């Protein structure tokens, strides 16, 4: 059998081209710009024109990407062997920031081993132990919101989720250490995508702004390594994620550092944005706001969680997730060559009327009905062996934030026009910052 081109190939032979789904003939650079800046309109137009499975090409090197929008096809990918569908390779651009031991960068046995070590800190009893800590931080945050004056709630959520990372994940409670870390970590989580080019072109790391970023990263690493060393000698009575990891596994300092930075970058902006969208919708919908307030008063966690889930459905923070084929494979009825990137289009699935009646409506009750959404139709955390390890933590965090805010305030939208989404790195955030106004209940 003739060899097939790899991911970085500029051209495909005619036989390979015939195995690919149909797709746009726009120049690769044009497709890349549309994907990066307008994916919420680019993907729906592509599906409308070419069907549920289509091909796009992205820089660098005109790489081939096959996009899936049917749940059965996406389940097929998520359920495939991780050795055939690699996810870590596609994240190598993140290595200068997250580190080579990051769970997001690992594949095969390395990924299985690291995930097994991390899982106990993100499930069951551990999550229940974090909930009270998150709730107290949320109560302290909402108590400082301005009354009767419009403000951008997305930034408040960013501040709060950073505090959760600092105190609940890192376990930092010393006031001086918190004051030292906050401004540094805020710069880390606000990193420009340009910095990630250092993963492709290491020579860039010797010049600004990459050199400036490395200096910042060294400052953060120095504090994190010091915190890890202190914690190794004092785990008694600790209930944070770092302490649980130290107590349960045999970790090197570098492995721990890489996981902490990964949790910071993967869990900060995503949860903050999801909650910004949730409050944006509640402020514009009095009936759903009243539903949430009743749930907060009654301690109805399932109903509060349903609000978080519906916000993640209607406004997926990450619009797509990818895999890279390590060998030729049959996917969605096509024989795809080794090196092909496969994208599961979360945003297309979440707004498909076949799976979510009236998909444009914000209706949390759909997650509480006797016939809830079918498996593979609600996938904000991905799926299969690569499903986000922090999914349970994120839902718990969102539930506690809603509980604190909805028990305290009424919400209004100063501008009733729905906010569009705008790309920010890999996420889609409210363009006007999720502007709301609150009054005491």
Feature map (PLM): residue ranges:
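Conserved cytochrome P450 K-helix E-x-x-R motif and the immediately C-terminal K′/meander segment
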Residues: 32-51, 226, 298-332, 353
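Conserved cytochrome P450 K-helix/beta-meander segment immediately N-terminal to the heme-binding cysteine loop
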Residues: 344-371
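Cytochrome P450 fold signature focused on the C-terminal beta-domain
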Residues: 235-239, 291-301, 314-334, 349, ...
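Cytochrome P450 heme-thiolate monooxygenase catalytic core
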Residues: 2-18, 86-94, 106, 110, ...
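Cytochrome P450 proximal C-terminal region
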Residues: 1-7, 16, 47-48, 138, ...
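N-terminal membrane-proximal hinge/A-helix region immediately C-terminal to the signal-anchor transmembrane segment
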Residues: 2-100, 104, 113, 128, ...
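Cytochrome P450 catalytic-core helices
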Residues: 270-295, 391-409
């Amino acid at each position: 059998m003739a060899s097939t081109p790899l991911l970085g190939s500029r051209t495909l032979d005619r036989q390979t081209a015939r195995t690919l789904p149909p797709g746009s003939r726009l120049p690769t650079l044009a497709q890349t710009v549309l994907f990066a800046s307008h994916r919420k309109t680019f993907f729906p137009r592509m599906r409308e024109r070419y069907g549920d499975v289509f091909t796009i090409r992205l820089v660098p090197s005109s790489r081939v990407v096959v996009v899936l929008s049917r749940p059965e096809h996406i389940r097929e990918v998520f359920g495939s062997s991780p050795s055939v569908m690699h996810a870590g390779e596609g994240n190598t651009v993140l290595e200068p920031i997250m580190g080579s031991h990051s769970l997001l960068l690992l594949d095969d046995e390395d990924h299985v081993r690291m995930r097994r070590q991390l899982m106990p800190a993100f499930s069951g009893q551990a999550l229940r132990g974090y909930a009270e800590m998150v709730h107290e931080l949320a109560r302290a945050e909402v108590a400082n919101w301005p009354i009767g004056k419009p403000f951008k709630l997305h930034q408040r959520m960013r501040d709060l989720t950073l505090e959760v990372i600092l105190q609940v994940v890192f376990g930092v409670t010393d006031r001086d250490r918190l004051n030292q870390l906050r401004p540094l970590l805020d710069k880390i989580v606000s990193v420009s995508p340009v910095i990630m080019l250092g993963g492709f072109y290491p020579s860039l790391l010797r010049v600004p702004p990459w050199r400036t970023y490395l200096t910042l990263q060294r400052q953060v690493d120095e504090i994190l390594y010091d915190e890890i060393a202190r914690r190794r000698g004092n785990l008694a009575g600790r209930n944070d994620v770092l302490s649980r990891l130290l107590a349960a596994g045999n970790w090197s300092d570098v492995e721990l550092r890489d996981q902490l930075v990964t949790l910071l970058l993967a869990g900060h902006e995503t949860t903050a944005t999801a909650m910004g969208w949730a409050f944006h919708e509640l402020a514009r919908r009095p009936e759903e706001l009243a539903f949430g307030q009743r749930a907060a008063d009654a301690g109805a966690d399932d109903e509060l969680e349903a609000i978080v889930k519906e916000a993640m459905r209607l406004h997926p923070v990450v619009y797509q997730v990818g895999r890279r084929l390590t060998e030729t494979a049959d996917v969605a009825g096509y024989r795809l060559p080794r090196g092909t990137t496969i994208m599961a289009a979360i945003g297309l699935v979440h707004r498909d009327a076949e799976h979510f009646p009236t998909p444009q409506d914000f209706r949390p009750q759909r997650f509480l009905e006797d016939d809830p959404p079918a498996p593979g139709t609600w996938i904000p955390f991905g799926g299969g062996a690569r499903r986000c390890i922090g999914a349970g933590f994120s839902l718990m965090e969102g539930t506690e934030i809603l509980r604190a805010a909805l028990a305290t305030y009424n919400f209004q939208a100063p501008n009733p026009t729905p906010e569009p989404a705008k790309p920010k790195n890999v996420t889609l955030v409210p363009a006007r910052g999720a502007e709301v106004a609150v009054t005491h209940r």
